[in-house]
Structure formats: structure tokens, C-alpha cells
Amino acid sequence: MTETPLNLAYSPSYFARDYEATLRRQAALGIDLVARHQPITLRYGKDPAARLNLFVPESTAGPWPLMLFIHGGYWQALDNTATDFLAERYLARGMAFTSLGYGLAPETSINTMVNQCLEGIAAACNALADNGGVWSIVLGGHSAGAQLAYWVAASDDIPIDKLILVSGVYDLTPLVDTYVNEALELTPTQALALSPIFADSSKLPPCQVVIAENDPPTFRQQAHDFVAALKTSHIQVELVDIANCDHFDVLDAL
């Protein structure tokens, strides 16, 4: 990444304490959990990255509330296992948990990523139907995953009961002139069309928008602007600002 002012403004790692250590720690926690609590692993579609891990509570019988989570990585990095570590806290609450994966840029477009996430959610729900069932669905996403989660919920194809968007990107238009777009290759028109803040949000479920104290200021401002837009659309929305966290370790506080 060339350290231009605009690139730095949209670089979460620039504002983070030690993002590489955080990602390593979270990955290790996920590996440890998988060793202790074997998930159901499913693939959907032809893309090798379109896969999920479904963790089912062992202490309670279904049907269960289901938490689905879409990882970040600016649409071009990481995979579903990056969020496996989150499953432990939801299992402790008696919830099933799914880490969703999707194909990455430049091979996969953002619209295709959304469709893959929809396929993954359907696969998870079908798998749970054979193992006790689902009685409510919460969908979460982090960073780029928050943008994908928004479009999944806005599609109205899956009955989402609550949306949790963490340190998300809600206006993609500034990214067109940044390093992020080297893989995405978005035109200004495409970036506008993919931006949740400019979309019709009237059918969204209740929404929680989470930001970290040490998120990039651009991300924090986007979150505030997005919440204001949702309120204008009469969506039930809560802004949660988590202190002493950055863009990466904010997931530890969920």
C-alpha cells in the first residue's frame, strides 16, 4: 500500500495496535474451539471459499436461535475460519453459530459474494432443520462482511430477525481511489450502487451498528451517517461505541 493520505484514512491496520497479533490470536482460539467442539462443515456452490462451519450447542436440544457471521478482509482476504472463535460465546448462550465464507476479489464480484452468503445461510438452515431446527436468525458481519450482511438482509430472501454490523463500510465511493480498489476494480457507479448508505433500507430488521473507539475516523463517521440514514428510514437501530478497541479486536467485545 502506498501511504497516501486517502489510503491511510481507509486503512484499519494503520489505526490498530497490532492487528497481526490480534488475527493470530483469534485464529488460534478458533482452532482450539474446533478441536473441542467439532462443527458441521458445509460447502455451497463451486467456489472453494464458499464454505461454512456450523457449531451446534451440545447442552440444549433444538430448535435454536442461530447466529450467522460474515468475516471481513476488504472483500479480498481471510476466510470463514477467521470468525470461528466467536462461536464459543454464542454456544454458551444456547445459540447455534455459523461462520460464513465467500469467494474473494479479484476473482469474485461483491454481488456474487452476497449471493454466496445467501446460499450459505440457506445451507446452514437446512442443516439445522435436520438437527433440531431454527427459531430465530441473527446475522452479523465485520468490516466488509458488514456490507455483505446488509445486502443479504436487504434482499428479503432470508427472514433475518436482527442485524449486527461491526466496524462496517457503508459508503464504498471513497474506496474507488484507494489501494482497496486494486482488487475490486469498482467504477464510481458500481461503488455507489453497492453502498448501503445510499440504498433503500426500509425492509431491514432491527439493526445494531457497532464501532470501535480506534476504528479509522472515516469508519466511525460512516457508522454515524449510516445510523442517521436508517433512522430516516424508520428502522429500529442502536449505535454501540466500544471503548479501548480497534478495528480488529472489537470482535473480542461482542
Q: Where do the model's predicted regions map?
A:
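N-terminal cap/lid segment of alpha/beta-hydrolase-fold proteins
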Residues: 4-61
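Short, surface-exposed "cap/lid" segments of acyl-processing enzymes
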Residues: 58-90
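Alpha/beta-hydrolase
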Residues: 70, 166, 242-245
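Glycine-rich His-Gly loop
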Residues: 70-74, 143, 168, 212
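Catalytic nucleophile-loop/oxyanion-hole region of alpha/beta-hydrolase
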Residues: 78-87, 98-136
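Primarily recognizes the serine-hydrolase "nucleophile elbow" in alpha/beta-hydrolase
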Residues: 119-183
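The feature captures the conserved acid-bearing segment of alpha/beta-hydrolase catalytic domains
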Residues: 162, 168, 175, 188-228
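C-terminal catalytic histidine-bearing segment of alpha/beta-hydrolase fold enzymes
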Residues: 220, 224-227, 231-254
